[in-house]
């Protein structure tokens, strides 16, 4: 089995395609179950965020994974990136460290990678290969963020959106802000807004208790999601980030809200994938809509300022990838030796138990020992004998040469080490 990662992100695919490729809620466990049912796949994990959808798998080949993704979201194959083995390891290390994020060094992605691992493990989709990889990923990401400043004062998508709102409304402290959702992104937005002060903070969520908790922490007012349309006209600024599959804020609703506001401008930030706000809202005069793709341009300055720390983190990742691959290769090299030893031990135990039973039954010791030695020799030598016979028939020189080194003609003979060629210099004496 080969380690593969296939995915798309904010750099390779537009937001509408990322919407279709996303896995949310109950769709994620069902997708993992579907993946594990593929005969070519032994392990799988899915990472799905607003900016990326990635499939990590131990599989025979990549084509079956591409086909599976195409079934989930037709038309995405042209936007996919694909890595295997060491490059797949490097990719996951970079993702978890925040080096592949829209906002360089953002901290949320590590938690999202941990969530992907936990869900895959809880639903039986992980084996020893991917589990080991994810565990090492958490260690590498922690070290990179501790030893460098790549995660220092990170600028998140939420904080970038709040900053844009502050720049657009010179007196944001006199404005009413509506937050839709109560997840991590909205929590961050609420935190930044409460630090900068707003006149009124409304928080609408499907689960009212979650909105009430967030409102109590930041001095806001909680609303059930069913009251969203009624309060939309009150909002000067709207931030939305939910896991809804369909838009929660429509063009018609915003148009009605603008009329009620007497065309007073409204600023909307759609931080969700799939999108929470209909894209056509941006066509309305006095409505200004930003999506996560728009925010990428706003965070580019931050990305440049953190490049030096990122380079240091990249060096740590390069070293850790090399060490991880070396460990895997050593484990792979040891596997045949372990199988050989296990075969020898099980054969010995089986035949020894049989010999002891024969002695217990009164069979002569010499006869039992003779049979034991004969059976042990035949049982242990049968697999290599059969393999060498096939090698000779198929002219497999590599295997027969290896056998010559393993089984020299003279008992006790040790093959000399392979000599290092002598390189003559230009001024060396010519051979006589």
UniProtKB/Swiss-Prot annotation:
Residues 407-432 are annotated as: Disordered. CDD domains: NAD_bind_Glutamyl_tRNA_reduct. The record marks 91 as: Important for activity. GO terms for molecular function: glutamyl-tRNA reductase activity; NADP binding. Pathway: Porphyrin-containing compound metabolism; protoporphyrin-IX biosynthesis; 5-aminolevulinate from L-glutamyl-tRNA(Glu): step 1/2. InterPro entries: 4pyrrol_synth_GluRdtase (IPR000343), 4pyrrol_synth_GluRdtase_dimer (IPR015896), 4pyrrol_synth_GluRdtase_N (IPR015895), GluRdtase_CS (IPR018214), GluRdtase_dimer_dom_sf (IPR036453), GluRdtase_N_sf (IPR036343), NAD(P)-bd_dom_sf (IPR036291), Shikm_DH/Glu-tRNA_Rdtase (IPR006151). During catalysis, the active site Cys acts as a nucleophile attacking the alpha-carbonyl group of tRNA-bound glutamate with the formation of a thioester intermediate between enzyme and glutamate, and the concomitant release of tRNA(Glu). The thioester intermediate is finally reduced by direct hydride transfer from NADPH, to form the product GSA. This is Glutamyl-tRNA reductase. The lineage of its organism: Bacteria, Pseudomonadati, Pseudomonadota, Gammaproteobacteria, Lysobacterales.
């Amino acid at each position: 089995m080969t380690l593969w990662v296939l995915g798309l992100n904010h750099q390779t695919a537009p937001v509408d395609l990322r919407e279709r490729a996303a896995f949310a809620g109950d769709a994620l466990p069902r997708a993992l179950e579907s993946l594990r049912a593929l005969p070519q796949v032994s392990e799988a994990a899915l990472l799905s965020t607003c900016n990326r959808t990635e499939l990590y798998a131990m599989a025979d080949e990549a084509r079956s994974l591409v086909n599976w993704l195409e079934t989930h979201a037709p038309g995405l194959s042209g936007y996919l990136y694909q890595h295997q083995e060491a490059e797949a390891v490097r990719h996951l290390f970079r993702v978890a460290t925040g080096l592949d994020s829209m906002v360089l060094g953002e901290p949320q992605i590590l938690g999202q990678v941990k969530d992907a691992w936990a869900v895959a493990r809880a639903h039986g989709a992980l084996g020893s290969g991917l589990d080991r990889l994810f565990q090492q990923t958490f260690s590498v990401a922690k070290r990179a963020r501790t030893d460098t400043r790549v995660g220092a004062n990170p600028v998140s998508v939420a904080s970038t959106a709040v900053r844009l709102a502050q720049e657009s409304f010179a007196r944001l402290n006199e404005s009413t802000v509506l937050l839709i959702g109560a997840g991590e992104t909205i929590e961050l937005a609420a935190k930044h807004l409460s630090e900068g002060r707003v006149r009124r903070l409304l928080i609408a969520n499907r689960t009212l208790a979650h909105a009430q908790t967030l409102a109590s922490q930041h001095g806001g007012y909680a609303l059930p999601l069913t009251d969203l349309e009624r309060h939309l006209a009150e909002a000067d600024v709207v931030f939305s980030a939910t896991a809804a599959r369909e838009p929660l804020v429509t063009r018609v609703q915003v148009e009605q809200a603008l009329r009620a506001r007497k065309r007073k401008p409204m600023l909307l930030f759609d931080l969700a994938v799939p999108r929470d706000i209909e894209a056509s809202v941006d066509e309305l005069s006095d409505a200004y809509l930003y999506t996560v793709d728009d925010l990428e341009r706003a965070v580019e300055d931050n990305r440049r300022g953190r490049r030096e720390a990122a380079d240091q983190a990249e060096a740590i990742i390069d070293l850790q990838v090399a060490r991880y691959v070396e460990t895997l290769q050593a484990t792979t090299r040891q596997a045949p030796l372990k199988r050989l030893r296990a075969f020898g031990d099980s054969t010995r135990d089986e035949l020894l138990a049989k010999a002891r039973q024969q002695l217990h039954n009164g069979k002569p010791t010499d006869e039992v020992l003779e049979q034991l030695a004969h059976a042990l020799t035949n049982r242990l030598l049968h697999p290599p004998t059969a393999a060498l016979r096939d090698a000779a028939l198929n002219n497999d020189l590599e295997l027969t040469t290896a056998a010559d080194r393993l089984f020299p003609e003279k008992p006790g003979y040790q093959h000399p080490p392979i000599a290092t060629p002598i390189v003559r210099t230009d001024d060396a004496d010519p051979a006589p």
